[in-house]
Amino acid sequence: MTYLAPALARIHPDWEAVLDQAAVAARLAEIDRLLVLQQQDGKTLFPPPPQVFNALAFAAPADVKVVILGQDPYHGDGEAMGLSFSVPDGARVPPSLRNIYKELAADLGLGVPASGDLTHWAQQGVLLLNSVLTVERDKAGSHGKLGWQTVSDALIDAVNRDNPGCVFLLWGNWAQTKAERIDASRHLVLTAAHPSPLSASRGFHGCRHFSQVNAWLIARGRQPVRWATAPAAQSCLF
């Protein structure tokens, strides 16, 4: 590996066996080759190479509490950081995340965080996973055909198989196609419209997923997620 080597060096060791599966490893090698070629052509790719597998840096598959699936990284400068829906501290909060925060506030009565950095969720076992893990600058969906789905599906399968019970939040039609990979007899699967401004009013707002997640975890003897640990300052969102 060349382009992906810095990112692979940062993952939790329990994910290594998943990425070492023959089909997954072969796909990763091909993705790595294509990313190197794009980089050599002068294309700017996001997220930065060390952050491509940021979602896998915090918890083993067996320790994940919640999976929040995204589609592909943000394609603007200074936005993508390897966690679905998350942006670095100081970056403008994107519209979909703004709606996630609004629902979080309405559901739990908490203040709206000023920062769009969701690292504090990841540190508690929230797997913020995009299906496609890279993108070319200013070209949404540009890496959708590189084969990343083989990799991300294997990661979902590992959580489904190895985790004693977690919650999958499937927001939007695309994420809901992954429901067939999840054993709903062991895991809780919650679905809603995507938080994008185009669809949030059609079933995302009012879904109360955050309180449902914690009630389910507590009932099974697991620690709830501290959804709001960053300073709240709603005026910073707009």
From Swiss-Prot:
InterPro entries cross-referenced by the UniProt entry: UDG_fam1 (IPR002043), Ura-DNA_Glyclase_AS (IPR018085), Uracil-DNA_glycosylase-like (IPR005122), Uracil-DNA_glycosylase-like_sf (IPR036895)
Gene3D superfamilies listed in its UniProt record: Uracil-DNA glycosylase-like domain (3.40.470.10)
Active site: 72
EC number in record: 3.2.2.27
Record protein name field: Uracil-DNA glycosylase
Subcellular location: Cytoplasm
Biological processes, Gene Ontology terms: base-excision repair, AP site formation via deaminated base removal
Principal location: cytoplasm
Similarity comment text for this entry: Belongs to the uracil-DNA glycosylase (UDG) superfamily. UNG family.
Catalytic activity: Hydrolyzes single-stranded DNA or mismatched double-stranded DNA and polynucleotides, releasing free uracil
Function statement: Excises uracil residues from the DNA which can arise as a result of misincorporation of dUMP residues by DNA polymerase or due to deamination of cytosine.
Lineage, highest ranks first: Bacteria, Pseudomonadati, Pseudomonadota, Betaproteobacteria, Neisseriales
Alphabetical UniProt keywords: Cytoplasm, DNA damage, DNA repair, Hydrolase
SUPFAM superfamilies: Uracil-DNA glycosylase-like
The species this protein was found in: Chromobacterium violaceum (strain ATCC 12472 / DSM 30191 / JCM 1249 / CCUG 213 / NBRC 12614 / NCIMB 9131 / NCTC 9757 / MK)
Listed GO MF terms: uracil DNA N-glycosylase activity
Record flagged with keyword DNA damage: yes
Coiled coil ranges: none
One GO cellular component, as annotated: cytoplasm
